[in-house]
Every structure is written in structure tokens, then in C-alpha cells.
């Protein structure tokens, strides 16, 4: 037990009871908090809960998770809750700090190992002169400012020299946190911009310099007894790095070669590597460098590829979500804001924040100016490089442990890191607004696209499972020399707190290097599939892209890209997939949110693809494509857009198209679509329904006239009285087709679909689309639900209908009129 529960000083003596680890239980009269294990479990739970609370509170402000973790530590420490003596002595007694700090450092050890695994040294080598000079320019001035302030903050009675103090403050102020910066860039949707790429590359270079300076600072701090100790520390560190590069790396490469491709690595090899992390930490700690340095270097020598991916997947969530917050909690327990006393000290704090931030901005602006960048972009770049995070906290904690930094300086620098990182997102949001070019183009629908012009399609993909059906659908879209297809493939990646998801920005696929993480591996698989399609198909151009966003705002990236690229049609997968027994199950409910938001905000037409086996019906070779396609036409702009797309597909020699138009058999007035009852909830303008009926008739007549000679195109009119007869008619043809193309029918109400919406599970598909996609539908038929761009409706009145596409084969059209009664 502890003989002293006062705040730690050099004279404190803490006594431990080694056998008091687990309790006999409260029924035996034991207090669980007197024993190490239950106390640690309570502390860990409290740290995670408080940290997650701040993550939830700060999420609307788009703050990185490191802010929440530092705030959680400060709240639990002597600055807030720790001011209560009872709380401090009960929850965080000094006798428990050793266990807590040991576990925190174990978590830190493995986290830095993962950072090393994910970091690609080749990217640093290929950053270019601009990123390198920007990184150096952004480090020099803050380092000099830290050195200048060290003279006023360093106490003459401290046992360590001024040089060591300068080094610690300089490193703390000049570093940039690469993982935190990646998160901020993704939140601000700058990660794929030029300024995002430059700042990420500069941050990587900065990170490498920071590790070198950190090793030097630790060596100087831990070797004050003899002047040659620092030299031996540096030599030993160099030898350790050489052993890792020339001995450990080849050994791990041998393990990778011995493991057959596609098979899992053995448990023995994984445990061997995880043990190697601890051994590396022990060695570097023993030679006078911090243990995290050894873990980081050990991670760097792990070859990129499946082994690195396996290690990341096994460790990252546990280490980042559970153990790493302990490190920030320890930092918070060491942070006593009350130690910052007097107006002069607070003035120094604000001066350090302002001048350090200004120094990095000025240094970056000067270098950026010489590279021809606008001043506003240089300022934004400088602000982004002010991001602080884990490396700075390591520097500060080492400085505190080595008595280089006193309580006042430590608390000051923690607040500096907190404020400098916290203000970046709002300031950059206000200051830097990328110039959005006003894009004005008329061909926002397939119906408006001329048959002799390029069709631009944006394909959204969540997982590789979406790829085969989409590729087959695109091949069926019949790209020709006269009307080629330009495909923008957008891999949609959720923005998470995991660093590995961020590193996809530095995709090294083109250099032939393997994927760094599962996200990049999936992206590579998707892109390779589409590029393979491009190579084997004629008149197709593919451009792969990646969007990293929260699902709540992912549609903004899709809409922005569609407008920038002047896209006419967006294809996005349905949120449900087919199961083995033929049913439909949801893969990720967030996909549905993306689809709904996209339908509401899209700048062009949208198609939601329900995949129920289309991938088994076609091949990449256009000569072997064979599809039976059906269009169910009820009327309205969405149905006309569906027919326009099917019309294009019908020109493919392997496509047979059936157009089934449903007509009410009582009164022509009833066939006109009427407004839905909830007018206020609909986004579409009030339409002249007779005009819409006229547009339907005109387009159908044009379609029939242009295709009268082609027997692969069948047109049928079916008279029905109500929704029940409509369902019966649809079910009668479900087994003879591979793909249904239907309009969503947004804002339209018809007696032909009366009652169908009452049982609708997915309103975003419309009444007919929901029926076809439901698990109750007998056949495994894929469905494409089309919504025409809203703004095109007003233009249709004055629009000439497009010429019919050029046909390459002579066939004959079949007409029919059916009454089911």
C-alpha cells in the first residue's frame, strides 16, 4: 500500500503490496479498489468512456480524435476531476500509476509499430523538391521560436543544460502529426486536392525528421553523466537500425516467401513478430533511446504486403481504441493547469501559441511563394502543418520524465498542442475555400445525350463484390466509336479514425508495390478489374478515383465529382445483396443513407443497381454478351430516362429488349399521373400532367418508329385496372428476363400502382423497383432503378428528342396489345 497519496515529488516514497492483485470479493470484506487488477479495469473503462464522450461532443465540430483523448486525460487529471482529493486517491492513487503507465507504454509501443508498418519510406523518397523544402521551411522557424522561448522558460537551477531544453521545446513546436493531418484533410474534403497531397507529403518528411530529433533529444536527456554517453547512444542506435534493415527485414521477407499466396500466416510467425516488437523496445531502451523508437523502426522494416495487412487488422482497433487512450490519460494526469501561475506565464503561453503557429505559416509561405503557389494556399498549407499529435506528446512526456520540463512548462506545451490542433479545422474552413468552377452543361441525362456524343458515367463502388455486375452492365451499354463511354470509377471509403484508411492517398499501386492495408487492397482490386475491362473492351476510357468521407456527407463528394466531370449518369449499388437462398439482406445500412442523399442532391440522372445475379449472365468480351432486358413503362420523366438507357443498350447485338407499357383501361384521364398527396414533401416542381402524358406518348412513338424494323426489340402495351393486375403482369414475365430497368417514379401517383407503396420497404426504389427488389419476388432478376435529373423536366418541353442511335443489325420490331382480363 502507499505511504503517501500526495502529488508526486522527488521525495515521494510509494510502497506496493505485490500480492494484492485480485480481490477475494466484497462479500469477504475486500474493497476492489485496493487491488491492482479491478482498479486498472475501472481506470481503463473510465478513460475509454470519457474519451468517447468527448469524441461524440466534438464530432459536429470535425475535430480529430487526438483532441478528445487529450481533453479526456486533462479532465481526469489534477486540472479538473483530480482537484477532488477523494477522487484522486480513490480512482487514480499513486500506487496505481505504475501499472497504468506500463500498460499505456505497451499500447504506445504497438501503436508506433503499426505507424511504422503503415508508413512507406518510398513515398518519402519520392515526395519531390517542393514537399521537401516546404517541410524544412515549416520546421526551421518554429524550432528557432522554441529555442528563443527556452531561455525565458528554462530555470537555471535545472540539472540539464540549455541545449537539451532547446531541443525538446524546438521538436515539440516544429513537428507535424501525419495521421491527425490526414484525418483533418479528409474531414475538410481536401485530401485529394493539390494542397492536400503537398501537405501530406511534407508531413511525412516532417515526421521522419521529428523521429531523428526525438532520438537525439532522448539521448542527450538520458546521458548527462559523461560527455561520451550521447555519442555511444547514437552509435548504438545506428547499429540497431542497420541490424533491422540488413538482418531482420530479409528474415521477415523469407517468412513471406515461405507462406503460399492466399494462405494465412501461421500463428507462430505472427507471435514471433509481435514478440520482436517488445524485444526491439527493450533494446533501444537499454541503449539509451526510448523504447518506442525501436518499435517504430521494427515496423518500418516490415515489407509492405499481406503480412503488414494481417498485423494491422489484428492490432489496430484494439491498440488504437483501448490502449492508446491510456497514454493520453497519463499525459492528462501529468498536466496540472493550476501550475501555470501568474499573468506573465499565461502571456507566455499565448505568445508561444501565436508565434509558433505564425512561424510555421511564415516559413511555409516563403517556401511556397518560391514554388509559385498563391499566398492564400501557402497560408493554408502552413496552418495544416501546425497539426500536433502523438509525436509531440511523446516528446513532452519524455521531457517530463527526464526532468527536462517542469510541471509549468509541460502543462503549457500540452495546451499549446491542444489549441494549435483544435483551431486548424475552423480556421482553414473559413480561410481556404477551393475555387469551385461554375459548371454549366445541358447533358445531365441520358435522354438529352446525343447518340453521336460521348456518354459519361460515374460508377460508385463500395466493395469488390459490386464490380462484376457493374462491369457487365457497362459492357451491355454498347460503347461504340461514334458514342464511346467514359467511366469514372469512384471507390467510396468511410472516413474513420484509423490511420490505415488515410494512407490510401499515397497509393503506390502504379509502382508495383503491394497494398498497405485492407482499404487499399480493396481499392487495388477494384481498379485492376476496371482497368482490365478497359484493356479488353473497345471505345471505353476508365479513370479511377477514391472518396474518403463520413457516410453522412459522402454524397457531396459524388455530386461534386459528377458535376466537375460533366457526368450524365451515376450508377450506385443497392444497399442489399443477394443471399445463398435467393433472399436479400442488408450489407451496410449506411449505404442506404448515401443512396437516399444522392437521389435528393444529384446533378444528373441516377441509377440504383440491385444485383441479383447479372454477373453470371455476361462476359467481358462483347461478342458473348447475352441479356434479356425488360423496361416497365408507366409514364413520367423517370420512365422516359429508363427507356432512353435501355434504347442505347438495345443496339448491342447480344441484347434483346422488351418494353412493356402499362395503360389504364377505364379512362384516358386516369392514365395521367397525378400528384402524390404529400406535395410539400416532394422536391419536384408542380407538373402539367397532360403535358407529361403527351411527352410520354411522343417519346414512345419516336421509339416505336425508329425501331420498327428490329425484331430484337419488342414493344407491348398491357391494359390493367389496378395495382393487383400490375403485380400479376410483372410476375408473369419475371422468369424470362435477366435485367429489369424501371423508373423510380418520384412524385408520380397512378392507379396502376395504387396500394403498392403501402407495403414498400425501400421508398428510394419507387413502387415498382421495390416490388422487383423484394425478397418475395420469385426470380433472381437484377434491377436498375432510374431517376432522371430533376432540372431536365423543365427543359423537355423545348427539347428536341435525340436522334435514334445507329443500328448495326437488321431485325424486326414486334408490337402487341394485351388485356389480362
Swiss-Prot record:
Superkingdom in the source lineage: Eukaryota
Sequence intervals crossing the membrane: 37-57, 65-82, 97-117, 131-151, 166-186, 200-220, 228-248, 268-288, 292-312, 318-338, 350-370, 378-398, 410-430
GO CC list: membrane
Annotated region described as Disordered, given as residue ranges: 800-821
Record GO terms (molecular function): antiporter activity
Subcellular location: Membrane
GO biological process terms on file: potassium ion transport; proton transmembrane transport; regulation of pH
Family matches, as Pfam families: CHX17_2nd, CHX17_C, Na_H_Exchanger
Membrane topology: Multi-pass membrane protein
Family designation: Belongs to the monovalent cation:proton antiporter 2 (CPA2) transporter (TC 2.A.37) family. CHX (TC 2.A.37.4) subfamily.
Protein name per Swiss-Prot or TrEMBL: Cation/H(+) antiporter 15
Protein source organism: Arabidopsis thaliana (Mouse-ear cress)
